[in-house]
């Protein structure tokens, strides 16, 4: 079964550049991490504060296909979904001045990891599995978590994906239990620091979490 595609890019509301907290953060900001790590919540707030456009790749896939993620998994399987995800990702990263929230499994393909690093500053939102479970265990829109033991599945996925997130990221931030606004303010500081170090050193640094 093939879903319809609509290639008009979906945008968030016009960025709030008047009250922007950007200082100087050029280019795209790409958020990676496990499901439940806060990519969408953080991404929307960050985009508003730094005057960029927010795009959620899962929402874009659903908009283009006209169906929810669980339906794609049911009909095409995870492999079919990953193929669509990669296609949409290639389209989106060509956009300028965006904050992109990726899907949790977007980093599974090596080409995707290279693409993300090439087209923006990649930020890994890292949260403990216990916190991920608290945020996701009632969510029926996550096909990989429709299992009898959500905690065990999250451990399995985290074990598989954490090294790939770390390999891909320029910045790693702990997105555990703190307010979204406090987290985003810390992230903006890290992004400014990262940009300064990139300018001086000529290559993106990997900033490890200090708290």
UniProtKB/Swiss-Prot annotation:
<keyword id="KW-0067">ATP-binding</keyword>
<feature type="binding site">
    <location>
        <position position="40"/>
    </location>
    <ligand>
        <name>Mg(2+)</name>
    </ligand>
</feature>
<keyword id="KW-0963">Cytoplasm</keyword>
<comment type="subunit">
    <text>Monomer.</text>
</comment>
<feature type="binding site">
    <location>
        <position position="58"/>
    </location>
    <ligand>
        <name>substrate</name>
    </ligand>
</feature>
<dbReference type="InterPro" id="IPR023000">
    <property type="entry name" value="Shikimate_kinase_CS"/>
</dbReference>
<feature type="binding site">
    <location>
        <begin position="36"/>
        <end position="41"/>
    </location>
    <ligand>
        <name>ATP</name>
    </ligand>
</feature>
<dbReference type="GO" id="GO:0005829">
    <property type="term" value="C:cytosol"/>
</dbReference>
<feature type="compositionally biased region" description="Polar residues">
    <location>
        <begin position="12"/>
        <end position="22"/>
    </location>
</feature>
<dbReference type="GO" id="GO:0009423">
    <property type="term" value="P:chorismate biosynthetic process"/>
</dbReference>
<feature type="region of interest" description="Disordered">
    <location>
        <begin position="1"/>
        <end position="22"/>
    </location>
</feature>
<dbReference type="InterPro" id="IPR027417">
    <property type="entry name" value="P-loop_NTPase"/>
</dbReference>
<feature type="binding site">
    <location>
        <position position="82"/>
    </location>
    <ligand>
        <name>substrate</name>
    </ligand>
</feature>
<comment type="similarity">
    <text>Belongs to the shikimate kinase family.</text>
</comment>
<feature type="binding site">
    <location>
        <position position="178"/>
    </location>
    <ligand>
        <name>ATP</name>
    </ligand>
</feature>
<keyword id="KW-0547">Nucleotide-binding</keyword>
<feature type="binding site">
    <location>
        <position position="161"/>
    </location>
    <ligand>
        <name>substrate</name>
    </ligand>
</feature>
<comment type="pathway">
    <text>Metabolic intermediate biosynthesis; chorismate biosynthesis; chorismate from D-erythrose 4-phosphate and phosphoenolpyruvate: step 5/7.</text>
</comment>
<protein>
    <recommendedName>
        <fullName>Shikimate kinase</fullName>
        <ecNumber>2.7.1.71</ecNumber>
    </recommendedName>
</protein>
<feature type="binding site">
    <location>
        <position position="104"/>
    </location>
    <ligand>
        <name>substrate</name>
    </ligand>
</feature>
<keyword id="KW-0057">Aromatic amino acid biosynthesis</keyword>
<keyword id="KW-0808">Transferase</keyword>
<dbReference type="Pfam" id="PF01202">
    <property type="entry name" value="SKI"/>
</dbReference>
<dbReference type="GO" id="GO:0000287">
    <property type="term" value="F:magnesium ion binding"/>
</dbReference>
<dbReference type="GO" id="GO:0005524">
    <property type="term" value="F:ATP binding"/>
</dbReference>
<keyword id="KW-0460">Magnesium</keyword>
<feature type="binding site">
    <location>
        <position position="142"/>
    </location>
    <ligand>
        <name>ATP</name>
    </ligand>
</feature>
<dbReference type="InterPro" id="IPR000623">
    <property type="entry name" value="Shikimate_kinase/TSH1"/>
</dbReference>
<keyword id="KW-0418">Kinase</keyword>
<comment type="function">
    <text>Catalyzes the specific phosphorylation of the 3-hydroxyl group of shikimic acid using ATP as a cosubstrate.</text>
</comment>
<dbReference type="GO" id="GO:0009073">
    <property type="term" value="P:aromatic amino acid family biosynthetic process"/>
</dbReference>
<keyword id="KW-0479">Metal-binding</keyword>
<dbReference type="GO" id="GO:0004765">
    <property type="term" value="F:shikimate kinase activity"/>
</dbReference>
<keyword id="KW-0028">Amino-acid biosynthesis</keyword>
<dbReference type="GO" id="GO:0008652">
    <property type="term" value="P:amino acid biosynthetic process"/>
</dbReference>
<dbReference type="InterPro" id="IPR031322">
    <property type="entry name" value="Shikimate/glucono_kinase"/>
</dbReference>
